[in-house]
Amino acid sequence: MALKAFSSEVDTGSRQENAPSQSWLIVADDLTGAADCAIAFGRRGRAAAVTWGEVTDASGYRLPVLAYDAASRGLSAAAAAVRHADVLTRLCQPGRILFKKIDSTLRGQPAAETAAALAHLKSRSGPAFGVFAPAFPATGRTTIDGRILVKGRPLEEAEVWRRDHTYSNADLVDVLATAGIRGEKVKLAAVRGGDLKATFARLAGEGDVVAACDAETEHDLHLIAEASLHASPATFFIGSAGLAHALAGLEVSHAVEPLRIPTSASGTLIVVGSLAGASRTAARRLEATGTVVHFPVAPETLLNDGAGRAALAADVMERLAGGGDALVEIMMDDHPDMSLGPQLAKGLADALEAVAPAIGAFAATGGETAAALLSRFGVNGIRLADEIEPGVSLGLTLGRLSVPIATKAGAFGDEHSLIRISERLRAVRTRGSFI
């Protein structure tokens, strides 16, 4: 199914959307990030979907909220900037507000991608103004004095930073400077003071600057969104799902008719490809419930063992076809080779491509893993329906395979997240409704 045609092919009831004036383009560096920002609008009644891959232009996408996965998390700064410039040229139509989704812990190339966004908007409408607020308080990410904290501790001390970081520190102005961007800190006192709108208006008037905003609570993000939305015609936003929820909350909410789908007797495929400790712990908890069969797979199998991959596919297909849920987990040691990520995702997609006809619902942790599998299953988009918990989006895949799907960034959630995801997907596929 073409993504642009989904509205006529999915039963959403007879409601006609009374859309607010804003339309949005969300450009993310991975799939889970694209989804958890888009659902901020989708859960408030805006038609929202995620797509990726080859998209010539946005002329056929009449959605008020379109999110695109640029798949740039693993690229160099120069390559990520080129990819974003190309995406923006094709998809950033006049009238759409740009939301540049970045990782809340600064993985990937957020500075280079932000520079590409500034350059694109400047070429189209003159000096641009960026509002940079990466905080996502619901997942423990805050920003104080222009620096990111994770659960109250400096980002530089967090597991995710030790495992993977691009910059020398987590100071937002320093990060922006690596791409030649002028940043100005807007500290918490200014966010909570009475002159925030004037501060943003001043910076927008200067142009070609990014306001790096503190935020400790969801209300702080609301204040930032409210004061900056109309700061200038060339204002754009840089942040994570926390800021997306704040911006979506400014719009009039509409009653949401739940998506309805045929019921399925096939089981749920749950794939854990993320290295984050949160996902690994959640996998152990889910396995302990006895509601899934655990299929651990070694990196060597995915890289070099064709017979092992075929055996994995046969076992997983048998489980799913019988109505049972399957938990497939890439097993890694304490010192994984991060450079193998794309190869492992491809190997897993090679192994599981054949099980697609037996899938009743699908969940994946880690954007790279999810994107590789979905592309191999013939999926070209996701129509978003709900949010299971902060950072966990629920929707319906579009393309050759149409099943309920949940996506989760690897480091989000707690030890019970996969249990909640499994239970929700089971309910959706057996009831035929996303309620």
Question: What residue ranges belong to the model's regions?
Answer:
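Cap/lid and interdomain-hinge subdomains that line or gate substrate/regulatory clefts
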Residues: 22-24, 47, 51, 64, ...
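C-terminal structural cap/anchor segments
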Residues: 316-365
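Conserved, well-structured core segments that form the ligand-binding/active-site neighborhood
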Residues: 149-312
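Short acidic, glycine/serine/threonine-rich loops at helix termini
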Residues: 37-39, 109-113, 141-149, 198, ...
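Short beta-strand segments
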Residues: 27, 67-69, 100-101, 131-135, ...
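Glycine-rich, highly charged phosphate/nucleotide-binding loops
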Residues: 54-55, 76-89, 344
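Conserved, well-ordered active-site substructure
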Residues: 360, 368-417
